[in-house]
């Protein structure tokens, strides 16, 4: 199913004559159908213990699988602050220019926004200030900005900030206003299913300083890290409705 869906997407992209395509790996990377594409950039957001039945139960084994998307001589970007050795070894073997969060690019939170610094393709230092807070992890947005910087496209701070301000990801901190029995209610949809996503959700719930109570309608597949996903949420959610 996934392979055919990926093939259909490639066909549609080709017909549309796209200038750019952003492709997300379904699982791992090395053996994923998306890895058929010889990408210009390879981005690895973070390395956690997800899909352990397929990728192994250590960060090193997961990093080895994710490193399969890297290409010889093509930039490799990693948002993990502690990239495991197998990833670094693959970067060295391929001669891929490596851009690491905390070394080559980074972000810093401010009172009402955040700041970014990074590198252009020629090594020139770049910076953006007072960027808007987002409905998706800012670590990922910072990684995306570094990827954009390496594509050598026009660098206009105002337009980049506006693009971030308009960015929405359906199903990730996705707020919907509705009426329930004549009373206004807010629905928050989030499909995060690993500890990293749950931690980010918890951070944003704390920052929102909600009035009233949160009811969580919660479901998780058996192969996920249930304890890790639930750990950040006690104290933030008062009532639970658990789907079997």
Task: For the regions a language model picked out, list residue spans one by one.
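Nucleotide phosphate-binding/pyrophosphate-handling subdomain across enzymes
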Residues: 20, 32-43, 47-51, 61, ...
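Glycine-rich helix-loop-beta junction characteristic of Rossmann-like nucleotide cofactor-binding loops
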Residues: 12, 68, 205-209
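Conserved helicase/translocase P-loop NTPase motor core
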Residues: 1-16
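Short internal beta-strands
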Residues: 75-80, 215-218, 238-244
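Acidic, Mg2+-coordinating active-site environments of NTP-dependent enzymes
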Residues: 4, 17-24, 39-128, 141-161
